[in-house]
Amino acid sequence: MPININKFILDMERFDGTLKKYPEDFIVEEITPEGTVLEVGKEIGFEDVEKWHGSFIHFTVEKTNWNTMDALKQIVRATKTKRKNFGFAGTKDKFAVTTQRFGCFGLKKEQLENINIKDIVIRDVQKTNKKLRMGGLWGNKFTIKIRDLNLSEKEIKRISDLKLDYVLNYYGIQRFGLIRPITHIVGKFIYERDFESAFYTYCGTPINETGDSLEARQLVDMGEFKKALKLFNRGHDYEKRLIQQYLKYKDFKMAFTALPPQLNSMFVNAYQAYLFNEMINKRFDYGFDELEGDILEDNTPTGTLIGYDTKFSGGIQGEIEKEIVERENLDLKKFKIEDFGNFYGTRRKMVTPIYDFKSRFENEIFELSFKLERGNYATIVTREFTGNLS
């Protein structure tokens, strides 16, 4: 089951290169709703609110080779508080240098300022009366280095002259799984209420794995759950939770209640994203200028994230959306999934602008910098040059 990322904006011969050779090659700096870039290594000096009610604190986390959730676990442990007391505006990947705002409830500034965790820096601690919510950011600034290039002077000149103003608004590989792109497959099984297949796909089905992880997944596929538990390591906490819950209740649906609700929602969201990516592919041949029947956002045609309350476009875009629904044999009402969430369906632009795009070659390194609005993927931009998603 592919992830449906097939088309390109740039008409060019793509080049091989190494992305993310070092964490410092992929810098992600969060941009606040007010447009402030949380620059790496820089104090911003956010001002405390004048009349603080003693509730909320926001702070910037700069981290190297930490994803958002693992960094948060360490911060929770260091402050001796609970995960539910914290929030963040957006998630960031691991193998990178990233900045982002976190929010917390019921802590003192000193508790945060005194934290000492390897490769994590906390700064810009600010007293506020506002809760930081998911999505509470404008977007991100990316600075990306692609190494190990072997290009002629002519090729360098050709690529340096390219200008990229917008990109196809695909959901990136991160939505489906970097190592094992199976999140959307699990989501489809959950939509179909085939929780047994969802369980085996997530815990078994080895892809690109070796050693204990490979053997553990093979044991799951053979039904040897207790043996598999002994081989899954600390990086497979969710697989272990699923198996333990299944062994306790002997019910595949009940097993998924051991996972965080956000993760269970992400499975179905990934299936919706997979279908959306296919809409982009089918619309590509018609172009992305406005056509009769389009539903627009910021004067840009949108596609639907299919859910129980989906409103179809008219015209050609509507035909594309309905064709996918019919081919997948979807019953929209089934996107109300007990214990997993109600996936009502929304709309998303099929192309998205790139802001402040710059590129340069230096010492056989191709460096890109640009800004994207929240919910958009930098690897879709780099893919335009390299053809690779990771």
UniProtKB/Swiss-Prot annotation:
<dbReference type="Pfam" id="PF01142">
    <property type="entry name" value="TruD"/>
</dbReference>
<protein>
    <recommendedName>
        <fullName>Probable tRNA pseudouridine synthase D 2</fullName>
        <ecNumber>5.4.99.27</ecNumber>
    </recommendedName>
</protein>
<keyword id="KW-0413">Isomerase</keyword>
<dbReference type="InterPro" id="IPR020119">
    <property type="entry name" value="PsdUridine_synth_TruD_CS"/>
</dbReference>
<comment type="similarity">
    <text>Belongs to the pseudouridine synthase TruD family.</text>
</comment>
<feature type="active site" description="Nucleophile">
    <location>
        <position position="93"/>
    </location>
</feature>
<dbReference type="GO" id="GO:0003723">
    <property type="term" value="F:RNA binding"/>
</dbReference>
<keyword id="KW-0819">tRNA processing</keyword>
<feature type="domain" description="TRUD">
    <location>
        <begin position="166"/>
        <end position="353"/>
    </location>
</feature>
<dbReference type="InterPro" id="IPR042214">
    <property type="entry name" value="TruD_catalytic"/>
</dbReference>
<comment type="function">
    <text>Could be responsible for synthesis of pseudouridine from uracil-13 in transfer RNAs.</text>
</comment>
<dbReference type="GO" id="GO:0160150">
    <property type="term" value="F:tRNA pseudouridine(13) synthase activity"/>
</dbReference>
<dbReference type="InterPro" id="IPR011760">
    <property type="entry name" value="PsdUridine_synth_TruD_insert"/>
</dbReference>
<dbReference type="InterPro" id="IPR001656">
    <property type="entry name" value="PsdUridine_synth_TruD"/>
</dbReference>
<dbReference type="InterPro" id="IPR020103">
    <property type="entry name" value="PsdUridine_synth_cat_dom_sf"/>
</dbReference>
<dbReference type="GO" id="GO:0031119">
    <property type="term" value="P:tRNA pseudouridine synthesis"/>
</dbReference>
